[in-house]
């Protein structure tokens, strides 16, 4: 079990010796739906709670494709027992953004957006958290407990190939218009890749899908599967299965297929190959990660990590198996943690 000395401290002495600007019972790192749910549950117990995020409120949802429709129904995205009403059976990205804004206002949650947590020092009951804002100003917070709910959408899974760092390569898809009349390669075969390929094709791009799998996965949204399959069948969207990208050039993409190597004319690439949690940040706090799947060591009942007083919540609990936890089940982590907070902070 890590001691105070085992948790790294990189604060300059003058900064570390200064008086924290805020004293808290609970600091939540990450303002996604799960982080908000954790803050609500802790605040409902009467604790002084603050949420910090290096981006905006529900930053991952904001970065979803502009016209994205959720696979789930609205009630499965609800937090804080606040109803989520939508115009149709499936909620849209815009509806979700509005809902989480309203929930934040309803509970008057203290959210510090665009605050990047740099260091966590101290011990259970007396942690020191240092963050920087957009202007580079340093903020110090002292808190009794910490909940880490940083998600995974910030860090794409890189392919490690030549040309991946070219400005024509993107790991997120927002909207199709800029790629009209362009040759576009979409790498991946899951929902994000299939939907991006369809959106691009509908808006006049010449699209080729490259996927390492033998066929499209069964997890595709039920309304997306027949659409993408028909576009491929009719040769409206090109597709290479059991194939990988070897190199990205200024005006081409080279792929390896089961039969040969193919060089495709190309203007833009969307490498939608998945994302992963910020393992380095978790390790910097002292949280141990499993060797194979990078799952954080934690009590499955309370979600307290191997660092006493530091809890993990949301998709980071699953490590690299990010498909195991969604908003639908991660939103309940706040209640699990709250039970332990009540026992330890009020007991």
Feature locations, PLM:
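Short gly/ser/thr-rich secondary-structure transition/capping motifs
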Residues: 6-13, 165-172, 251-256, 291-297
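A short beta-to-alpha transition loop/helix N-cap that caps and shapes the active-site region
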Residues: 58-62, 70, 216-220
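A Rossmann-like FAD-binding core segment of flavoenzymes
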Residues: 106-108, 112-136, 140-143, 202-293
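Flavin (primarily FAD) binding-site architecture
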Residues: 148-164, 275-287
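Short, well-ordered coil/turn residues at beta-beta hairpins
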Residues: 149-150, 156, 172, 187, ...
């Amino acid at each position: 079990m890590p001691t105070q000395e085992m948790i790294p401290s990189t604060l300059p002495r003058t900064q570390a010796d200064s008086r924290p600007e805020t004293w808290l019972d609970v600091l939540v790192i990450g303002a996604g739906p799960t982080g908000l749910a954790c803050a609500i549950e802790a605040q409902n117990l009467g604790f002084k709670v603050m949420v910090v995020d290096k981006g905006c409120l529900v930053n991952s949802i904001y970065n979803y494709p502009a016209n994205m429709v959720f696979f789930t129904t609205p009630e499965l995205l609800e937090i804080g027992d606040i109803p989520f009403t939508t115009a149709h059976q499936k909620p849209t990205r815009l509806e979700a953004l509005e809902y989480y804004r309203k929930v934040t206002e309803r509970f008057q949650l203290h959210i510090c957006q665009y605050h990047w947590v740099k260091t966590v020092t101290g011990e259970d009951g007396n942690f020191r958290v240092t963050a920087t804002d957009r202007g580079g100003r340093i903020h110090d917070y002292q808190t009794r407990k910490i909940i880490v709910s940083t998600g995974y959408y910030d860090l794409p899974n890189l392919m490690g190939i030549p040309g991946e760092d070219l400005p024509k390569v993107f790991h997120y898809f927002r909207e199709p218009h800029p790629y009209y009349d362009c040759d576009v390669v979409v790498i991946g075969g899951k929902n994000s890749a299939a939907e991006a390929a369809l959106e691009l094709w509908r808006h006049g791009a010449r699209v080729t899908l490259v996927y390492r799998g033998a066929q499209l996965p069964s997890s595709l949204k039920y309304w997306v599967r027949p659409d993408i399959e028909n576009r491929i069948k009719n040769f409206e969207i090109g597709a290479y299965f059991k194939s990988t990208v070897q190199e990205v050039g200024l005006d081409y993409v080279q792929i390896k297929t089961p039969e040969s190597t193919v060089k495709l004319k190309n203007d833009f690439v969307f490498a939608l190959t998945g994302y992963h949690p910020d393992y380095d940040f978790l390790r910097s706090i002292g949280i141990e990660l499993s060797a194979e799947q990078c799952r954080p060591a934690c009590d499955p009942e309370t979600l307290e990590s191997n660092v006493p007083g530091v809890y993990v919540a949301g998709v980071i609990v699953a490590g690299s198996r990010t498909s195991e936890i969604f908003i639908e089940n991660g939103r309940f982590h706040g209640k699990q943690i709250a039970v332990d907070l009540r026992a330890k902070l009020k007991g």
